[in-house]
Amino acid sequence: MQVVRDEPRVAAVARLATDDGELTVVSTHLSFLAGWNLLQLRRLVQGLAGERRLVVAGDFNLPPDAVVRASRLRPLAAGATFPAHDPVRQIDHLLGRGGVTGTGARVWDLPLSDHRALSVELSLRVSPAG
């Protein structure tokens, strides 16, 4: 039996003040180990339950359908991101909730990673109360 060691995983959280209210943005890199990455995603989203407007972005090491089922967040962008030299699948994601929408999604070929970068222009819907 061989044990695969995974590196520690974290999420960086920023709360941004915008003209349309506060937005919480999270960047993460989930495990490559099947099942473990789903658990990490569920725990991350549970920990962010109180955040009204939310964007979660990063390398999830999961396909889009699994990400949506596990997170219950809305995809803001789509595109094949891996492997960088000939991308055939999306494992990097931009997700949102709370009136956050995305337009102009783009996949970038950058020399910095074995993944391609995914970007989107964000818009915040102003709630009737504010």
Question: PLM ranges: what are they?
Answer:
Residues 1-130:
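Active-site regions of metal-assisted phosphoester/phosphodiester hydrolases
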